[in-house]
């Protein structure tokens, strides 16, 4: 009988566990290892950059820490692991730095009446420890004392299985060190589903001296920024027909008492418990960490009560695979644990932290206030949208439900950046923070941006376009987006998003004006006084003339201003404005004269708008990007009332154009750098397109395209732009532009009439004229400008005969090739070899490879003189170097020993292509090389000798056999 507190021994008590407990241990460890493999197998410098990675790992660790907790018989509920964790202050004070911060929060919170607050603080501590890579260092002292563990856990708990605990810590170390090789040290048989779980055998240190292990936080915490840590914690991309677990913040209401758990199931998986408020301001007040040390989002992330996966699932469903890690699904089978949240205090919404800059729709806050007050189940229908996070909005609760649809973008990790505030009011933490684990059909990301004690903490949905706040203008909404930090794919999607915003705004204005016209017509029909109608008509015409005069100077100023609209853009004329306002009334004119919402706030806020903001550079205002075009267009309507950004409805709903993130490939148990195809894994390729259109691929084209027929070529492209895939009506195909390099038609956004030399025309016709190419082709040709990709001998060998300059360069390259081979074996030619390296290597090593830069330099006459200078320097060295003189040839025909010839002397030397021997051109008159004839005669003589020896051996064998047989007969 071994003492319980004598340290951890491998396999202790494992053989006495029932089959059900071993299966649960296997399932928990398998889920953890699958998640860790998905995090560390991508060679990303930040393991939390993977979409939904931190959320899934938190869920797996919650399942392990909840497994086997002893139930509280007095309160008839399961205790939380916070009591188990917080005693690390006494077991290992050096490792309790992070725990003490959360202990102070729990002790200062006076509103807690049950264990739900402990659960919230424990889950916050778990998220914080995983984010800062210090969870294993904190768990080691706790797991080293088995007697202490038995105070909180049953004998069948996961933490009392030494083999599984060792594997768990190994997985945590792999994440903390971002080293997938540590996973290979775990015995693979540990995860095999057998009747008896084998003992764990690792190739590294075990847990023998755990009680004495200490943890010292590194000093580099203040310098590290963990992008994508909490930002992806509560995100999930909407998927049609799928239900997902999520977390939402109820704005108010007392905590509900939990239901009794059924069987051996953790509380986080069987029920949803709403925690009482936890004061985060107390944490900021008592915590010794600076805002930098707390990183971007330390304690502002909500708690999700459904992290722990169900232990009653079949073992076949235990491994969800890393593909769900990529798309953010907490449960691919769509299980939900419905609960109802009651709200009794709708007035307390001002003290909560719902931000208008979060990725949640405004109606979700309203549903928490209104729908939950009636006791019904709140069903949120918010749809997420990707964007850079905006830091400039005041944290206010928005009410009023608006039905709109927004697109979800492709998976792109965007690090949120700080930006100047657009308002004078700073976001303050004005009340306690209620935590609740709540299930709904769509996840609620709950992005928060808080500022307390001078420190900013950002917890935004990473790469998510936030929803505009109530009444926020389009100019303010578009100007605050950080498009400069977006990836290329995100910028492409932003192009469509901003275009849809402008189109939706214009259509909304038209709709409002048409409705006003109809109302006025109805009023006029009721009004029978003809004199009043004539008077109203005169007033409308007069106001129309005044408005037209006011618009003309504004557009003249725009033509001479910093922002200019391209010729392809549609110009707004006075006739158009007259048509728009022809049926306006006095109220209508007054509405159009109202200033924009942000412009009329105050001078301080207007000075921070897009036009005058110092955060946007001067070159950005002059650029032709989508956001610059949008802002320039909106700037012309500053004096008029524009619809708020929150009032827009997207033209293409989500159900009409469903999009979701592409699943990542299966995780690798080892580092891709060590695999057989490591070079392939390093390439991050995202294949895009559909059955009708695919984006152009980088390809080298050697053939000249035939003269295109626009109607036939566009029909082959399915009337879509070859660059962006936008559909064009057959009546407008004349607006498409032809790319001479790819031989396809592009829209005006993807083809800006850039001109480049076409490689196929250079190689076929020696034509260096510049032709119109698309933006994609231009970028491709610029990238390959210096790459030796064109073999003139294989593509068009007749070009040497047609172009004298090219043939001269070819002869010089032949001489340099022979010289360089000779100088490589001469110890006195090191400086000369360095001068040879000043030109690209293919010019002196491969005779017929050219780049576009080489061909252009040849045509201009610049390449020939450079190569001729190197040739003269090499010939001078050979004349003076005795080592190189010894490598020369003596002509076999004239046998002139005074005239040593070399292969690079093309004017007097002829080199045999077979044996590389050199002769004088005047002496070499016969058709064959004498050295080749000697070598051939020698080979034939050797062949005859080998054949004769083989035949002689074959004839001797029968004679020896007959003599042996005669000797045997004589002996008998």
UniProtKB/Swiss-Prot annotation:
<dbReference type="GO" id="GO:0002376">
    <property type="term" value="P:immune system process"/>
</dbReference>
<feature type="compositionally biased region" description="Polar residues">
    <location>
        <begin position="378"/>
        <end position="401"/>
    </location>
</feature>
<keyword id="KW-0523">Neurodegeneration</keyword>
<feature type="modified residue" description="Phosphoserine">
    <location>
        <position position="528"/>
    </location>
</feature>
<feature type="region of interest" description="Interaction with CYBA">
    <location>
        <begin position="567"/>
        <end position="625"/>
    </location>
</feature>
<feature type="domain" description="RUN">
    <location>
        <begin position="48"/>
        <end position="189"/>
    </location>
</feature>
<dbReference type="GO" id="GO:0005769">
    <property type="term" value="C:early endosome"/>
</dbReference>
<feature type="compositionally biased region" description="Low complexity">
    <location>
        <begin position="338"/>
        <end position="368"/>
    </location>
</feature>
<dbReference type="GO" id="GO:0043231">
    <property type="term" value="C:intracellular membrane-bounded organelle"/>
</dbReference>
<feature type="region of interest" description="Interaction with PIK3C3">
    <location>
        <begin position="49"/>
        <end position="180"/>
    </location>
</feature>
<feature type="region of interest" description="Disordered">
    <location>
        <begin position="562"/>
        <end position="589"/>
    </location>
</feature>
<feature type="region of interest" description="Interaction with BECN1">
    <location>
        <begin position="505"/>
        <end position="557"/>
    </location>
</feature>
<dbReference type="InterPro" id="IPR037213">
    <property type="entry name" value="Run_dom_sf"/>
</dbReference>
<feature type="region of interest" description="Interaction with UVRAG">
    <location>
        <begin position="300"/>
        <end position="600"/>
    </location>
</feature>
<dbReference type="GO" id="GO:0010507">
    <property type="term" value="P:negative regulation of autophagy"/>
</dbReference>
<comment type="function">
    <text>Involved in regulation of pathogen-specific host defense of activated macrophages. Following bacterial infection promotes NADH oxidase activity by association with CYBA thereby affecting TLR2 signaling and probably other TLR-NOX pathways. Stabilizes the CYBA:CYBB NADPH oxidase heterodimer, increases its association with TLR2 and its phagosome trafficking to induce antimicrobial burst of ROS and production of inflammatory cytokines.</text>
</comment>
<dbReference type="GO" id="GO:0005829">
    <property type="term" value="C:cytosol"/>
</dbReference>
<dbReference type="GO" id="GO:0005654">
    <property type="term" value="C:nucleoplasm"/>
</dbReference>
<protein>
    <recommendedName>
        <fullName>Run domain Beclin-1-interacting and cysteine-rich domain-containing protein</fullName>
    </recommendedName>
</protein>
<feature type="modified residue" description="Phosphoserine">
    <location>
        <position position="388"/>
    </location>
</feature>
<dbReference type="GO" id="GO:0005764">
    <property type="term" value="C:lysosome"/>
</dbReference>
<keyword id="KW-0597">Phosphoprotein</keyword>
<dbReference type="InterPro" id="IPR048569">
    <property type="entry name" value="RUBC_PIKBD"/>
</dbReference>
<dbReference type="GO" id="GO:0006914">
    <property type="term" value="P:autophagy"/>
</dbReference>
<keyword id="KW-0581">Phagocytosis</keyword>
<keyword id="KW-0254">Endocytosis</keyword>
<dbReference type="GO" id="GO:0005770">
    <property type="term" value="C:late endosome"/>
</dbReference>
<keyword id="KW-0967">Endosome</keyword>
<feature type="region of interest" description="Disordered">
    <location>
        <begin position="307"/>
        <end position="446"/>
    </location>
</feature>
<keyword id="KW-0072">Autophagy</keyword>
<feature type="modified residue" description="Phosphoserine">
    <location>
        <position position="197"/>
    </location>
</feature>
<feature type="modified residue" description="Phosphoserine">
    <location>
        <position position="671"/>
    </location>
</feature>
<dbReference type="GO" id="GO:0071985">
    <property type="term" value="P:multivesicular body sorting pathway"/>
</dbReference>
<feature type="compositionally biased region" description="Basic and acidic residues">
    <location>
        <begin position="13"/>
        <end position="22"/>
    </location>
</feature>
<dbReference type="Pfam" id="PF13901">
    <property type="entry name" value="RH_dom"/>
</dbReference>
<feature type="region of interest" description="Interaction with CARD9">
    <location>
        <begin position="672"/>
        <end position="760"/>
    </location>
</feature>
<dbReference type="GO" id="GO:1901097">
    <property type="term" value="P:negative regulation of autophagosome maturation"/>
</dbReference>
<comment type="subunit">
    <text>Associates with PI3K (PI3KC3/PI3K-III/class III phosphatidylinositol 3-kinase) complex II (PI3KC3-C2) in which the core composed of the catalytic subunit PIK3C3, the regulatory subunit PIK3R4 and BECN1 is associated with UVRAG; in the complex interacts directly with PI3KC3 and UVRAG. Interacts with Rab7 (RAB7A or RAB7B) (GTP-bound form); Rab7 and UVRAG compete for RUBCN binding; can interact simultaneously with Rab7 and the PI3K complex. Interacts with CYBA and CYBB; indicative for the association with the CYBA:CYBB NADPH oxidase heterodimer.</text>
</comment>
<feature type="modified residue" description="Phosphoserine">
    <location>
        <position position="248"/>
    </location>
</feature>
<feature type="compositionally biased region" description="Polar residues">
    <location>
        <begin position="436"/>
        <end position="446"/>
    </location>
</feature>
<feature type="region of interest" description="Interaction with Rab7">
    <location>
        <begin position="721"/>
        <end position="972"/>
    </location>
</feature>
<feature type="modified residue" description="Phosphoserine">
    <location>
        <position position="562"/>
    </location>
</feature>
């Amino acid at each position: 009988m071994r003492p319980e507190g004598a340290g951890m021994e491998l396999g202790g008590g494992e053989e006495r566990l029932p089959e059900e407990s071993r299966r649960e241990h296997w399932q928990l460890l398998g889920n953890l290892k699958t998640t860790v493999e998905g995090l560390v197998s991508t060679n990303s410098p930040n393991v939390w950059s993977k979409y939904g990675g931190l959320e899934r790992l938190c869920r797996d660790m919650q399942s392990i820490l909840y497994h086997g907790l002893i139930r509280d018989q007095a309160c008839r509920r399961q205790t939380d692991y916070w009591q188990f964790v917080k005693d690390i202050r006494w077991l290992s004070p050096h490792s309790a730095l992070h725990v003490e911060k959360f202990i102070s929060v729990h002790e200062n919170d006076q509103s807690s009446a049950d264990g739900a607050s402990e659960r919230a603080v424990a889950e916050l501590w778990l998220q914080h420890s995983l984010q800062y890579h210090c969870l294993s260092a904190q768990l080691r002292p706790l797991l080293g004392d088995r007697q202490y563990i038995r105070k909180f856990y049953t004998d069948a708990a996961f933490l009392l299985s030494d083999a599984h605990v060792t594997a768990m810590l190994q997985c945590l170390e792999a994440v903390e060190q971002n080293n997938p090789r540590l996973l290979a040290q775990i015995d693979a048989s540990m995860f095999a589903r057998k009747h008896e779980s084998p003992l764990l055998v690792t190739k590294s240190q075990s847990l023998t001296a755990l009680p004495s292990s200490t943890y010292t936080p590194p000093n580099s915490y203040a310098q590290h920024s963990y992008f994508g840590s909490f930002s992806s914690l509560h995100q999930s991309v909407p998927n049609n027909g799928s239900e997902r677990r999520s977390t939402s913040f109820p704005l108010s209401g007392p905590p509900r008492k939990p239901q009794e758990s059924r069987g051996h199931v953790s509380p986080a998986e069987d029920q949803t418990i709403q925690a009482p408020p936890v004061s985060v301001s107390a944490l900021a007040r008592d915590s010794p960490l600076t805002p930098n040390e707390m990183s971007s989002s330390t304690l502002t992330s909500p708690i999700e009560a459904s992290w722990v996966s169900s232990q009653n699932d079949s073992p076949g469903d235990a491994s969800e695979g890393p593909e769900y890690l990529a798309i953010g699904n907490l449960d691919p089978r769509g299980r939900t644990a419905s609960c109802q949240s009651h709200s009794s205090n709708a007035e307390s919404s001002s003290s909560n932290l719902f931000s208008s800059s979060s990725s949640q729709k405004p109606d979700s806050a309203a549903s928490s206030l209104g729908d939950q007050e009636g006791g019904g189940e709140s069903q949120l229908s918010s749809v997420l949208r990707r964007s850079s996070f905006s830091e400039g909005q005041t944290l206010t609760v928005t009410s009023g439900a608006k039905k709109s649809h927004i697109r979800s973008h492709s998976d792109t990790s965007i690090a949120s950046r700080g930006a100047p505030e657009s308002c004078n009011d700073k976001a303050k933490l004005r009340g306690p923070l209620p935590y609740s684990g709540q299930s709904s059909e769509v996840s609620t990301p709950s992005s928060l941006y808080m500022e307390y004690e001078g420190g900013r903490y950002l917890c935004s949905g990473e790469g998510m376009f936030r929803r505009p706040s109530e009444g926020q203008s389009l100019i303010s909404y578009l100007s605050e987006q950080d498009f400069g930090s977006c990836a290329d794919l995100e910028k492409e999607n932003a192009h469509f998003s901003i275009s849809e915003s402008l189109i939706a705004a214009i259509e909304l204005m038209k709709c409002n004006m048409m409705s006003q016209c109809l109302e006025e017509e109805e009023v006029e029909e009721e009004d029978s006084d003809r004199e009043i109608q004539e008077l109203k008509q005169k007033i409308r015409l007069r106001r129309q003339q005044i408005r037209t005069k006011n618009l003309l100077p504004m557009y003249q100023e725009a033509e001479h201003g910093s922002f200019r609209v391209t010729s392809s853009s549609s110009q707004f004329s006075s006739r158009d404005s007259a048509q728009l306002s022809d049926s306006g009334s006095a109220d209508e004119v007054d509405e159009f004269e109202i200033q924009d919402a942000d412009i009329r706030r105050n001078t301080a806020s207007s000075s921070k708008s897009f036009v005058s903001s110092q955060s946007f550079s001067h070159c950005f205002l002059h650029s032709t990007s989508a956001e610059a075009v949008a802002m320039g267009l909106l700037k012309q309507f500053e004096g008029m009332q524009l619809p708020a950004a929150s009032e827009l409805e997207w033209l293409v709903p989500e159900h009409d154009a469903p999009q979701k993130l592409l699943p990542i490939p299966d995780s690798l148990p080892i580092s891709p750098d060590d695999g057989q195809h490591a070079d392939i894994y390093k390439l991050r390729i995202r294949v895009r397109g559909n059955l009708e259109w695919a984006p152009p691929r980088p390809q080298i084209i050697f053939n000249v395209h035939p003269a295109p027929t626009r109607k036939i070529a566009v029909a082959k492209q399915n009337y879509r732009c070859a660059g962006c895939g936008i559909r064009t009506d057959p009546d407008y195909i004349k607006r498409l532009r032809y790319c001479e390099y790819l031989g396809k038609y592009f829209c005006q956004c993807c083809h800006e009439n850039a001109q480049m030399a076409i490689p196929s025309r250079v190689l076929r016709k020696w034509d260096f004229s510049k032709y119109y190419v698309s933006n994609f082709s231009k970028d491709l040709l610029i990238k390959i400008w210096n790459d030796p990709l064109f073999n003139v001998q294989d593509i068009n060998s007749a070009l040497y005969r047609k172009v004298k300059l090219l043939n001269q360069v070819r002869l010089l390259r032949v001489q340099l090739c022979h010289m360089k081979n000779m100088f490589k074996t001469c110890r006195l030619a090191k400086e000369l070899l360095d001068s040879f390296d000043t030109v690209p290597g293919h010019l002196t090593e491969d005779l017929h490879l050219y780049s576009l830069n080489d061909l252009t330099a040849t045509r201009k006459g610049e390449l020939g003189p450079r190569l001729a200078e190197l040739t003269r320097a090499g010939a001078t060295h050979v004349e003076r170097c005795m080592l190189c003189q010894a490598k020369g040839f003596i002509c076999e025909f004239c046998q002139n020993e005074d005239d040593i010839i070399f292969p690079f002397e093309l004017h007097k030397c002829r080199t045999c292509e077979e044996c590389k021997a050199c002769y004088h051109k005047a002496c070499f008159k016969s058709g064959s090389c004498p050295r080749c004839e000697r070598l051939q005669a020698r080979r034939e003589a050797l062949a005859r000798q080998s054949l004769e020896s083989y035949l002689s051996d074959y004839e001797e064998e029968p004679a020896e056999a007959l003599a042996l047989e005669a000797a045997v007969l004589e002996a008998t």
